[in-house]
Amino acid sequence: MNKKLLCAVMFSTSLVSSMLCGCNSTSNDGKVEVELIQYKPEAVKAFEKIAENFNSTHSDIHLTIQSPNEAMTVLKTRFIREDYPDIIGIGGDINYSNFLDADMFMDISDFEVVNDIKPSYLNMDKELEFIPKDGVYAIPYVANCAGILYNKDMFAEHGWEAPTTWEEFNQLCQTIQSEGITPLYFGFKDTWTCLAPWNALAVGLAPSTVCSSVNAGETTFSVEYREVAEKMKSLLQYSESNPYAYSYNDACTAFARGESAMFPIGSYAVPQIQSVNPDINIDSFVFPANSDEKDNILNSGIDLQFSVMKECKNKEAVYEVLRYLYEDDTIQIYLDDQNAVPCKEGDFTLPSMLDGVKSYIEEDRMADFHDHHYPSEMSVDAMVQTFLMDDSSNAIDTFLSKFDANWIRYNRDLIKKVQDYIRGYNNEI
């Protein structure tokens, strides 16, 4: 295990006092013990049911699934102590990139379920590799989507249609405004909400490999993100008055109460909205960032995936656990509990609020959230909020220049590593 690399990705953590011993062993009753730690505590009920079902149907393996709060802190603390679980469940984001770069995961390309995963999601994991690697190191499980939620009953009452192009979207917003209704509610007081429309626009307007291309010295964000920034800024004309005064919870409440026709956010917001108004009829559409519908892409990212630790000693037992996790009926337990999107091909029941984007899911027209590649210390959400609040004539240029400068500042070592790899690769050709 590369401890030097692992320490590099560690942040300050508190030692966790009570931890189970990882890397499966045999219990007193002769069963192989398999430990899985996953990072979504909100899904604890689903995983309790999954573990119970598995253990009741397997006489030779005992599965323990932990769903702790602050799971990433728990995992990083355990890793530095070399106390590894067998399987971890994390998102497809920068944390996965860092763990993979630290050589922590087993190559599981021989696991048969890999062939059943939608190619878009497998590709997202490959794009998260800092340096290209042979093999498969995570199996995507479920995803979420982000675009625009809309009040389906309000649309029907007014005769509005979901737009499919940028021009249709602007015309719709103007029509809604003319009828005295707020088209969009943002809730930009919480800076992270600024990334919801940002990501949804970026997947349609910039390459999914933009961050890797910048690291390679092939382009800049000033070039690739200009149209994203321009269109993001233009959305403000359709928002609530002073969107920076209202939080995510405020936006969910306002949309639930019919104070806006649309809400640019991910499917993860639906339970919060329904807690205010259980009867609201919600659907969604892909953010129509382009003038041609064929160029639009659904913003969908891996919300949960499973990786096997390289130190795992009983691959056969772990694979049996994974086979059970990826059975259609098991996945459906999670989907029903969390309103998620399956990463596996199959005949699954999706929540109704995804009806408007279902064709994109079925056609595999999806790309990852760009912020999954952003280092957290760069605080891109706060940068976007500051940019949106800047009314100066050169706001876009200022923002893009800062994005380029900060990217270099916070990724200096990674950029050097990537460019050294490219030079070495080219010298070998």
Task: Give the ranges of each region predicted by the language model.
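Extracytoplasmic/periplasmic solute-binding protein
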Residues: K133-Y141, A146, N170-G217, S260
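Glycine-centered hinge/linker elements that transmit conformational signals in sensory
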Residues: T175, N215-Y244
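Hinge/lid segment of periplasmic solute-binding proteins
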Residues: G91-A146, N170, I176, P197-N199, ...
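Extracytoplasmic "Venus flytrap"/periplasmic binding protein-like
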Residues: N53, T57-Y121, D153, E157-H158, ...
